[in-house]
């Protein structure tokens, strides 16, 4: 069954999601896009991307449509989710990627408009469930879970790492630092922002800031509630990030044992295709366009006094996340 999807918000994640489903060849039809920009701009930004390059498809537009390789997509421009006629358009699932309507009370307006499910491409509030693919998708209940969060890109990276460590060795506690590419929530030049550090020029500074990714891991691995915390360091690259996780384990381990656990998880089981494993000396640009949620860098594993372990996972914070959003769409759509 082809899954009929509407996208609300055609920004970085909305467009990356569109490209990812084309590349995956997923059985998903984009029926409509709702975005406040004009169709000429929407089509142009889909066709040309600074990071991913030119879309390998023919793109054209009219006043209220865009056409990609002969497939015409309706373009709407509604500010209020309640005004979008998803039901009339036959949309099954809405991708809520504006970054604005992350509360359940707002997101479920899409359901009132006729959609069956809403997938929020961000951490959410009061959502029915947060799902990190490869970690807790088995907890999904189609009868009761309608507003679903795909968590954050960083949670999608750190949760698989925490899952492997906790299942194999047991986590007592841990701290995380995400070395994160700058995003549209920062300023290109110094300009007011409620976070005074994010008010500073993104391409000229290393910017310490907050992240809820470590704590949010407990939403998908509840046994880790209260055990993890962390911060973010925003750095001057447009994409390509890394999660540095330091934990105290319940038992003593060696570097080889830790790496072997990650190698096994990457090769087999729920994390195959989601967690990658590398022994190469890579840098951030090497994972641009990488579909993994996390590429585990085995050469950087450190063990101190047996129980203190430091590991690092790379992730393309846009592309990897968007690929998981496609996976989640297929997962939920196949159970409609």
From Swiss-Prot:
Sites where the protein binds NAD(+): 12-13, 35, 79, 121, 184, 317
Tagged with keyword Cytoplasm: yes
Keywords attached to this entry: Cytoplasm, Glycolysis, NAD, Nucleotide-binding, Oxidoreductase
Binding residues annotated for D-glyceraldehyde 3-phosphate, in chain numbering: 152-154, 183, 198, 211-212, 234
Pfam family, one: Gp_dh_C
Annotated catalysed reactions: D-glyceraldehyde 3-phosphate + phosphate + NAD(+) = (2R)-3-phospho-glyceroyl phosphate + NADH + H(+)
Site (Activates thiol group during catalysis) residue list: 180
Oxidoreductase found in the keyword field: yes
UniProt record similarity statement: Belongs to the glyceraldehyde-3-phosphate dehydrogenase family.
Record protein name field: Glyceraldehyde-3-phosphate dehydrogenase
Organism: Streptomyces coelicolor (strain ATCC BAA-471 / A3(2) / M145)
Gene: gap
């Amino acid at each position: 069954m082809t899954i009929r999807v509407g996208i609300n918000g055609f920004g970085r994640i909305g467009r990356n999601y569109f490209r990812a489903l084309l590349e995956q060849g997923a059985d998903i039809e984009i029926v409509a896009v709702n975005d406040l920009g004009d169709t000429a701009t929407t089509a142009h930004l889909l066709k040309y991307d600074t990071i991913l390059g030119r879309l390998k498809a023919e793109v054209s537009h009219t006043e209220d449509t865009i056409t990609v390789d002969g497939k015409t997509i309706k373009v709407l421009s509604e500010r209020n989710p309640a005004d979008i006629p998803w039901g009339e358009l036959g949309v099954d699932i809405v991708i809520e990627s504006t970054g604005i309507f992350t509360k359940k009370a707002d997101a479920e307006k899409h359901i009132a408009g006729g959609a069956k499910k809403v997938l929020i491409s961000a951490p959410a509030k009061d959502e029915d469930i947060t799902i990190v693919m490869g970690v807790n998708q088995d907890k999904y209940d189609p009868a009761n879970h309608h507003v679903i969060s795909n968590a954050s890109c960083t949670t999608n990276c750190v949760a698989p790492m925490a899952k492997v460590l906790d299942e194999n060795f047991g986590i007592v506690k841990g701290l995380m630092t995400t070395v994160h590419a700058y995003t549209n929530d920062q300023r290109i030049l110094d300009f007011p922002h409620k976070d005074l550090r994010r008010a500073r020029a993104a391409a000229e500074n290393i910017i310490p800031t907050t992240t809820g990714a470590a704590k949010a891991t407990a939403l998908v691995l509840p046994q880790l509630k209260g055990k993890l915390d962390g911060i973010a360091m925003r750095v001057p690259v447009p994409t390509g990030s890394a999660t540095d996780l330091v934990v105290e384990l319940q038992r003593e381990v060696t570097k080889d044992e830790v790496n072997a656990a990650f190698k096994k998880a990457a090769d087999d089981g729920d994390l195959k295709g989601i967690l990658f494993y590398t022994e190469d000396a890579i840098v951030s640009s090497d994972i641009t366009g990488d579909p993994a949620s996390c590429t585990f860098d085995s050469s950087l594993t450190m063990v101190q006094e047996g129980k203190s372990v430091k590991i690092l996972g790379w992730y393309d914070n846009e592309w990897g996340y968007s690929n998981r959003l496609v996976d989640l769409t297929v997962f939920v759509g196949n159970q409609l």
